[in-house]
Amino acid sequence: MTFPAFLSPDPTWDGDSTGGPLLLTVRFSASIPDFPLDIENPDITTAAGLKQLIRTHLPPNLSSHRLRLIYAGRGLEDATPLSVSLKLPPSPSRTPVVQEDATTVKGKGKAPIREQPRLYIHCSIGDIVLSDADLAAEAAIATTLQQEQADEGYTGRKKQQQPPPSTTSAPRGFDRLLSAGFTPSEVSALRSQFMAIQSVSRTPDTMPTGAELRELEDRWMDEGSSAMAAGVPGGGEGISFADDDGGFGAGSRGAMDDMLWGAVMGFFWPVGCAMWLRREEGVWSWRKGLAVFVGVVINVAFGAMRIMN
């Protein structure tokens, strides 16, 4: 089995720029056991290079399939170095701390050596088989050094041909996942689920669209669903799924208010609520509408009990 060329030390790369290898453990979605990988040059090795290395450990029938690398809930972009994608700390903190002197000053014995923990990378193996051209394109961006060499090759031609500046804005929201290997249909399905979550606690006229929707998607991808559930401390204008998912858990700050006011309105003002809902459809969220219905049922129950007694 041959290993990709980018794993061997490059004479043009300064080896002192990193403090040690990056220890990874690859976990597959298929029934393939985990295996460890040591990346010698994480500052120049990209996610595409990691895919090339993973392919050498896969069975022959899976080595050409499309791979997706996920770390901490985010897809790794092929052309980005691992040190940037994984948000690694500076190199001195990644290396094991080994003391030069075996004994401490006051005769306390040998100091323990802290081993560097391994990072877990989830690898999803798709059903699509990549062509030779796709595999060659993936290998071409295996390291940043190869990208720099390719850039130097056509720098002169770019100077001669001055194209007009592109007005296309950078992808925002879930469109950023397209560069990580997701298909347009998968991005569309994810956006549909996100809109369904938002529609639970929003009326049709307050649903986010355009730039506001992309901003919500960016915030969800950057901060993660756990951070969104925790809310934004110190401000009342932050958007979080805990406030807007329409749930009834302890994390929903507006759930109790909606249930209380909805039940009170349904109990004391059932006819007015019915006329209001008839004239302005979608004025309440699903949660408050359910609370109003509960209040009306309680009103009817109390009236029936009074008539029977």
UniProtKB/Swiss-Prot annotation:
GO terms for cellular component: Dsc E3 ubiquitin ligase complex; endoplasmic reticulum membrane. The chain crosses the membrane at residues 257-277, 289-309. It holds the Pfam family Dsc3_N. Residues 88-110, 148-177 are annotated as: Disordered. Pathway: Protein modification; protein ubiquitination. It comes from the Eukaryota. The keyword Transmembrane applies. Coiled coil: none annotated. It is a multi-pass membrane protein. Glycans are attached at residue 61. Keywords: Endoplasmic reticulum, Glycoprotein, Membrane, Transmembrane, Transmembrane helix, Ubl conjugation pathway. It is found in: Endoplasmic reticulum membrane. Belongs to the dsc3 family. Component of the DSC E3 ubiquitin ligase complex composed of dscA, dscB, dscC and dscD. PANTHER family: DSC E3 UBIQUITIN LIGASE COMPLEX SUBUNIT 3 (PTHR28049:SF1), TRANSMEMBRANE PROTEIN YOR223W (PTHR28049). Component of the DSC E3 ubiquitin ligase complex which is required for the srbA transcriptional activator proteolytic cleavage to release the soluble transcription factor from the membrane in low oxygen or sterol conditions. Required for growth during hypoxia and triazole drug susceptibility, as well as for virulence in a murine model of invasive pulmonary aspergillosis (IPA). This is DSC E3 ubiquitin ligase complex subunit C. It comes from Aspergillus fumigatus (strain CBS 144.89 / FGSC A1163 / CEA10) (Neosartorya fumigata). The gene is dscC.
